[in-house]
Amino acid sequence: MYHRLILLALVGTTMANVIPFSMSNIPEEYKEFIPEEVRNFYKDLTVEDKEILRELASKHATFANEDAALEALKDKSDKLYKNAVELRNFVKAKIDSLKPDAKIFVDEIIAKARSLRSDDGHKLDTEKIKQAARDIIAKYQALSEETKEELKVTFPAIAKIIGNEKLKRNASTFLQKN
């Protein structure tokens, strides 16, 4: 269970940086687990900013890469672009600080999270998310203890999640096969 929570936290943090969402959709008791930098980014969004993010998210399949998406964002809102780049740089610096094994693992999580986005803007497939989480858990369990510890230190929000009994129960229920 401990491993599942760590991985769900990593996936959640990654998804927060890959898929625009509204902080208002997250129950209050879980908001504390979202990194402060991510919370601040979403807290400062205007209605117009949210609409721009929704529009660009619906077109994500048309962007060759993250830089192309950021350029499209810059064309829509310079302020939003600067905030997004700041958040991206924060996450990138955390990832770049990791040793090779941990970095490869996080890069795989990001790639997996990006692959879950639907090209047509429809709702995410819950079964695909569950399978992706199971795959990531298996990879995580194969990591050395040193690498696991490095991930916990680099992503401190994970430490909060590990001790939360309600989240442990929810994660276990969510990942159960039908």
UniProtKB/Swiss-Prot annotation:
What is the recorded name of this protein?
A: Fatty-acid and retinol-binding protein 1
An example molecular function term from Gene Ontology annotations: retinol binding
Q: How is it modified after translation?
A: Not glycosylated.
Upper lineage is: Eukaryota, Metazoa, Ecdysozoa, Nematoda, Chromadorea
Q: Where in the cell is it found?
A: Secreted
The keyword tRNA processing belongs to this UniProt entry's keyword annotation: no
Q: What is its main location?
A: secreted
Which ranges form a coiled coil? 67-89, 130-153
